[in-house]
């Protein structure tokens, strides 16, 4: 095509000559423009944000940080289960440290165990204390329910919960 041919084609104002208009596509159904004005893509629905469900009871856990906090916990009350061991000391607020060594597995597996333990501790509604939870290598094989029961058992043995 030469420039002469392009200049010879009349171009409608504001439309790209390469793309067919909505009325020119033979596959397009009649009235399709009206459907777009309703439903999830409607102009009034585009600005609205989806509402999040309310958070589960318990809220976010505060992490135990610093070597000194972990050192103090060595003298704390202890409890042990099949998959975890716990140590705790009374404190003005609940702080949790979760330790999952490389013996448990690669990073993906360790993070999965940590996520499960955080959720379990959040759901247990623990009293104010500094708490250390150390996962054993067997924790990678445990189901969520087994891990939950084991953490609860270890916390009962240590005296943190009844």
From Swiss-Prot:
Which GO cellular component term is one of those annotated?
ribonuclease P complex
Q: Name one GO biological process term.
A: tRNA 5'-leader removal
Q: What does this protein do?
A: RNaseP catalyzes the removal of the 5'-leader sequence from pre-tRNA to produce the mature 5'-terminus. It can also cleave other RNA substrates such as 4.5S RNA. The protein component plays an auxiliary but essential role in vivo by binding to the 5'-leader sequence and broadening the substrate specificity of the ribozyme.
- Tell me which EC number(s) this protein carries: 3.1.26.5
Q: What class of enzyme is it?
A: hydrolase
Keyword Nuclease, does the record have it? yes
Q: Which Pfam families match?
A: Ribonuclease_P
Q: Which InterPro entries match?
A: Ribosomal_Su5_D2-typ_SF, Ribsml_uS5_D2-typ_fold_subgr, RNase_P, RNase_P_CS
Q: What is this protein called?
A: Ribonuclease P protein component
What does the UniProt keyword field contain? Endonuclease, Hydrolase, Nuclease, RNA-binding, tRNA processing
List, as start-end ranges, the regions of compositional bias called Basic and acidic residues. 21-31
Reaction(s) catalysed (UniProt annotation): Endonucleolytic cleavage of RNA, removing 5'-extranucleotides from tRNA precursor
- Quote the subunit structure annotation: Consists of a catalytic RNA component (M1 or rnpB) and a protein subunit.
Q: Which family does it belong to?
A: Belongs to the RnpA family.
Record has Cytoplasm as a keyword: no
Report residue spans for region: Disordered.
1-67
Q: Give any extra note attached to this record.
A: The open reading frame (ORF) for this protein entirely encompasses the ORF for the 50S ribosomal protein L34 (rpmH). The two start codons are separated by four nucleotides.
Q: Its Gene Ontology molecular function terms?
A: 3'-tRNA processing endoribonuclease activity; ribonuclease P activity; tRNA binding
Origin species:
Thermus brockianus
- Which PROSITE patterns is this protein grouped with? RIBONUCLEASE_P
